[in-house]
Regions:
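Thiol-based oxidoreductase modules, predominantly thioredoxin-like and allied folds used
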Residues: 78-102
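Boundary at the C-terminal end of the N-terminal hydrophobic targeting segment
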Residues: 32-35
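Solvent-exposed loop/turn segments at secondary-structure junctions
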Residues: 57-60, 86-91, 128-131
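Short, conserved sequence motifs used for protein processing/export or organelle targeting and
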Residues: 95-115, 127-266
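Ligand-binding face of N-terminal immunoglobulin V-set domains in extracellular IgSF glycoproteins
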Residues: 122
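Bacterial N-terminal signal peptides
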Residues: 19-30
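Local sequence-structure signature of Cys/Sec-based thiol-disulfide redox active-site neighborhoods
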Residues: 43-84
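Bacterial N-terminal signal peptides that target proteins for export
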Residues: 3-20
């Protein structure tokens, strides 16, 4: 199977495994359904996680289902990641779109050779793309990719009496993926929006896990590395996460859990 292509045909080949996957994730969602809207996303140190990106837009008729699915997956603790709203297909008012989201999606088209861009598109670990509103396909893709690709957890240590964090990365053997870049992603507070126009006009939608800014912290060659940085959060930010991505293959190599601002945690 070519992991650089959507898993549209793959999902039907292992129905028993898929059923078990769906039942497992259903239990995650059932447990978290009554939880607070802001979940604490954390993973034990050095345990692999799954990194999910959703390329979405308010103008897309299928996107609300994908946005909700992304929120459920992240809140369940099954994955970390964000929703990235593209600007080439968007509403005229109340837009959440960002030009860098369109660029990231175009970069994935090149990395994955996945054909024309579309929404909603979900990218798993930077390796596989799948239609973001197709729950069965998304869950099967997550299960499959988590078995073939390891995304290490980055532990961020807040420094005492400071707004800085320490990042420590162990050396890894990933020569084919180097060089890589270490990114800081700012995650917004939830957006409660009545969509003004387009396919979802008039719908009241709560958008969660929206990334509004990404910033490159520094390059990485795969060697052991420790450095500090200040996220400089604003009131509009729920929190942030740090992730490492190959500049050669687009593969996500490591990620922190969502680090929430004090206002979001209170």
């Amino acid at each position: 199977m070519n992991i650089n292509r959507p898993l549209y045909n793959y999902v039907n080949k292992e129905p028993l495994k898929l059923l078990l996957t769906l039942l497992t994730l259903w239990s995650f969602f059932a447990v978290t359904a009554g939880a607070e809207e802001t979940a604490e996303l954390s993973s034990p140190d050095n345990q692999p996680i799954v990194f999910v990106e959703l390329f979405s837009t308010q103008a897309c008729g299928f996107c609300p289902d994908a946005d909700k699915l992304l929120s459920d997956i992240i809140q369940s603790g099954k994955a970390v990641g964000f929703g990235c709203h593209v600007d080439y297909f968007d509403v005229k008012e109340g837009s959440l779109s960002q030009p860098f989201c369109s660029k990231r999606q175009a970069d994935y088209t090149r990395f994955l050779q996945s054909g024309p861009t579309y929404t909603p598109q979900m990218i798993i670990n930077g390796l596989v793309d799948v239609m973001g509103h197709k729950t069965q396909q998304v869950l099967e893709a997550i299960d499959h990719v988590s078995n073939i690709s390891t995304v290490s957890t980055i532990a961020l240590q807040p420094l005492e009496d400071s707004d800085h964090y320490q990042v420590s990365l162990d050396a890894i053997d990933a020569e084919d993926d180097m060089p890589a870049a270490i990114w800081l992603a700012y995650i917004d507070q939830d957006h409660d929006i009545t969509v003004a126009d387009g396919a979802n006009r008039g719908q009241d939608i709560i958008y969660k896990n929206i990334v509004s800014k990404v910033k490159e912290l520094q390059a990485w060659d795969g060697g052991a590395l420790t450095f500090t940085f200040s996220p400089m959060l604003e009131e509009s930010h729920k929190g942030f996460l740090v992730f490492v991505q190959s500049q050669i293959t687009g593969k996500i190599l490591a990620s922190s859990p969502l680090m929430q601002s004090e206002d979001s945690e209170s």
